[in-house]
């Protein structure tokens, strides 16, 4: 379960940035997690809850934004956005998204699509309370 490693790394990064002052608490952590990042949101939430115990992030809320998958045609340059929810709802039984992605560019028909967005795993911001 690599979500635990992600949660621990997130807490380490925030603790390093904010220090370990007893009067500092993280209330909300804003993340951007692409549907192709390999991170399963419910597993990350559970792992984070466990990893945060006894840290400045204990009790913090994870506010997660899911950006679209962006495909670019190498022939015509057309970019196509696919919502992460659509892809996640259409995965096959093995959790694969590849079989659902369009095989060709909707604009020119070329089978030359490259994924240029949707793999994000970013710490965007943290809302902190002092005192």
Swiss-Prot record:
Q: Does the keyword Ribonucleoprotein apply?
A: no
- Which species? Thermomicrobium roseum (strain ATCC 27502 / DSM 5159 / P-2)
Q: Which UniProt keywords apply?
A: Metal-binding, Nickel, Zinc
The name of this protein is Hydrogenase maturation factor HypA
Q: Which PROSITE patterns match?
A: HYPA
Which domain of life, per UniProt? Answer: Bacteria
Can the keyword Ribosomal protein be found in this entry's annotation?
no
Gene3D superfamilies on file: 3.30.2320.80
Task: State the family it belongs to.
Answer: Belongs to the HypA/HybF family.
The Swiss-Prot or TrEMBL record annotates one GO molecular function as: nickel cation binding
The entry's Ni(2+)-binding residues are: 2
Q: Which PANTHER family match?
A: HYDROGENASE MATURATION FACTOR HYPA (PTHR34535:SF3)
* Role description: Involved in the maturation of [NiFe] hydrogenases. Required for nickel insertion into the metal center of the hydrogenase.
Enumerate the transmembrane spans. Answer: none
GO biological-process terms attached to the record: protein maturation; protein modification process
**Residues that coordinate or bind Zn(2+):** 73, 76, 105, 108
Q: Which Pfam families match?
A: HypA
């Amino acid at each position: 379960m690599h979500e635990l490693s992600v949660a621990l790394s997130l807490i380490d990064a925030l603790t390093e940035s904010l220090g370990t002052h007893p009067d500092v608490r993280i209330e909300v952590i804003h993340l951007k997690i692409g549907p192709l990042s390999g991170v399963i949101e419910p597993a990350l939430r559970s792992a984070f809850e466990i990893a945060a115990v006894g840290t400045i992030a204990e009790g913090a809320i994870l506010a997660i934004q899911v950006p679209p998958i962006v495909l670019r045609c190498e022939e015509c340059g057309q970019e196509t956005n696919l919502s992460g929810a659509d892809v996640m709802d259409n995965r096959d039984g093995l959790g694969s998204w590849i079989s659902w992605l369009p095989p060709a560019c909707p604009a020119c028909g070329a089978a030359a699509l490259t994924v240029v967005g949707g793999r994000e795993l970013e710490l965007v911001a943290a809302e902190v309370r002092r005192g």
